[in-house]
Amino acid sequence: IDYVYQHADYIAVNISSPNTENLRNLSLSDYFSSLIEKVMNKREQLAKGADTRKPIVLKISPDESEENFEKIIVKSMETNVDGLIINNTSINHFKGVKGGISGNYIKNLSEKNLKFARSICDENLTLISSGGLMTKKDIENRLKLSADLIQLYTGFIFRGTDLLKESLEIQ
């Protein structure tokens, strides 16, 4: 955080990358509570020196159990995390396939997790929907499901600026 704070518009704490060994263990309650408290304390220290408070958002795995997902959301609200990115790449996929899956393969899971998160979080916690956003209709649906923002990756890779143009047409 020290290195990026002055340059960033916001800081994403990614505890969900399927490509970093043991990183997802940070979402377990013992590790997560300590980690997020340290991150938020560091942010407050840096905000005082910089006269600006950069938002901290947490990127969550779509593979969390409902129980742990709820614990992460509750702890995020308790520590004043500014937002959650729901979701990252999934590791639950076809037998024998290595790496993470994204795009259409996690669309339904991302929608389910967004609905669940919205049902337990307050309006002060920004929800950023990611995962399976391939079309304008997908984006409209996430906004209807009460996403505050969207984050495009796979859809942008496959559709390029056409998807961006379509998303700007949404009222």
Across the structure, where does each feature detected by a protein language model lie?
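Glycine-rich phosphate-binding active-site loops on the catalytic face of alpha/beta enzymes
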Residues: I15-S17, G83-H93, I139-E166
